[in-house]
Swiss-Prot record:
Highest taxon above the source species: Eukaryota
Protein name: Probable tRNA modification GTPase MnmE
Cofactor: K(+)
UniProt-listed Enzyme Commission number(s): 3.6.-.-
């Protein structure tokens, strides 16, 4: 049985909390029989009111008490799924939660599939598909900023914009269809139509320009530089723990070390890489190839140089490829006039630090933050990959429409392109495989 074909009138049940010893375990039901099934295992069976907590006990088939619980009934349509929903709040623990779950299954409830509660919320019109995806994105948010974006979309920020764009396209389609049906002289004034179309394309492009990957995956920062420049020491200083191995021997780091942390609500992913030098073994060759690969995929490069040898050039493949900060390390060893001369002739943002003694580390962090805020703005709307693909498809149909207008194609072709763009933005026109792909990512109980 696929999620898209679930018969939503039956009653489902699942443990909604992490199954482990804890303070509280929540067992959730949804469906027409949710209230009856919950009452069937509870001692107190009267005076159940929607959205009011009930203190009672759960008992088994032999009337043996299982646990003291709080029960919260939520009658349709004022619930997450717009069905009758009941949450049983028991003491945390594997045995108690599973016992209550099994009692409810024995009485006729079906064990929910991953994401089935949210799927029912979507099918019953409680959430749009974009909002349903936002629930998942909120659960898996890697940073405070991403959580805020997910919550904003859950409250309808993206759905509202998509609805607005789609409504404007429908208005354009209505103009075309009305002309085809009723205009006998077969003339159509395109100036206003073209202006509206251009405005809609710009709206879609603005959504596509949102750098959403930074919210979802964080800012990727690569530490690159020659061997023995102190990259690993600086890496450890930035993340606040001893993650990379540090020795006086050049070339100690032979593999990429990654660490993730949050600064000012943004997720940063730091990569410590092997020092760049003339390879003396196959391992070193592979390590430096990996470092160059990280350089290509990251968003910001820290080019780290030993302050005692400040004249080492930046490799050509790093020049003008992406934002780059030059970090002169080991100023505790040497901060000579030669370094000052080099700094005067460097076009990239620079900072002098001592990773060993954390000198100017706050200044380096501030520079990293400044570069990050130039990559994206915190007030943008988040769109995921599926939504981005649909927006790109809609835009392509509209661009094809523009070409058709320029080439004098009949209005029937214009109408066809408009209908295709409108369909791309229809949140209710989703096939079963897409629904399965989305909701199967949820945990059971959500």
């Amino acid at each position: 049985m696929t999620l898209a074909n679930v018969f939503i009138q039956d009653t489902i049940v699942a443990i909604a909390t992490y199954l482990a010893p804890s303070s509280v375990a929540i067992i959730r039901l949804s469906g027409n029989e949710a209230i009856r099934l919950a009452k069937s295992i509870c001692v107190k069976k009267n005076h159940w009111h929607s959205h009011r907590i009930i203190h009672t006990y759960v008992q088994d088939d032999q009337n043996q008490l299982i646990d003291e619980v709080l029960v919260l009934p939520m009658l349709a349509p004022r619930s997450y799924t717009r069905q009758d929903v009941v949450e049983i709040h028991a003491h945390g623990g594997v045995v108690v939660a599973q016992t209550i779950l099994q009692l409810l299954i024995n009485r006729g409830a079906r064990l929910a599939k991953p994401g089935e509660f949210t799927l029912r919320a979507f099918i019953n019109g409680r959430l749009t598909l974009t909002q349903a995806e936002s629930v998942l994105e909120l659960i898996h948010a890697p940073s405070v900023a991403m959580a805020k974006k997910a919550l904003s979309n859950l409250r309808g920020a993206l759905s509202t914009q998509l609805h607005q764009v789609r409504s404007e396209l429908i208005q354009l389609l209505a103009q075309i269809e009305a002309h085809l049906d009723f205009d006998l002289d077969n003339t159509f004034v395109f100036n206003s139509f073209i202006n509206s179309l251009t405005n809609i394309i710009n709206q879609i492009q603005n959504l596509l320009n949102t750098p959403s990957k930074f919210y979802r995956y964080g800012i990727q920062v690569a530490l690159l530089g020659p061997a023995n420049a102190g990259k690993s020491t600086l890496f450890n200083a930035l993340i606040g723990e001893e993650r990379s191995i540090v020795t006086p021997i050049a070339g100690t780091t032979t593999d990429v070390v990654e660490a993730t942390l949050q600064w000012q609500q943004i997720c940063f992913r730091f990569f410590d890489t092997a020092g760049l030098k003339e390879a003396s073994s196959e391992i070193e060759t592979k390590a430096m190839a990996k470092a160059q690969q990280i350089a290509k995929q990251c968003d910001l490069i820290l080019w780290i140089i030993d302050a005692t040898s400040p004249n080492l050039p930046i490799p050509p493949y790093l020049l003008n490829s992406k934002p780059l900060l030059v970090v002169y390390n080991k100023i505790d060893v040497d901060s000579s006039d030669v370094l000052d001369h080099v700094l005067d002739h460097t076009s990239y943002p620079t900072v002098k630090v001592s990773a060993l003694y954390a000198t100017n580390l706050s200044q380096l962090k501030q520079l990293i933050w400044q570069q990050a805020t130039q990559l994206f703005q915190l007030d943008g709307i988040y769109i995921n990959e599926r939504q981005s693909q649909l927006l790109q498809q809609a835009k392509q149909h509209l661009c094809n429409l523009q070409s058709a207008l320029d080439e004098g194609y009949p209005l029937e072709i214009i109408s066809w392109h408009l209908k295709n763009a409108i369909q791309c933005l229809d949140e209710n026109d989703v096939n079963a495989s897409t629904l399965n792909a989305i909701f199967s990512q949820f945990c059971i109980g959500k």
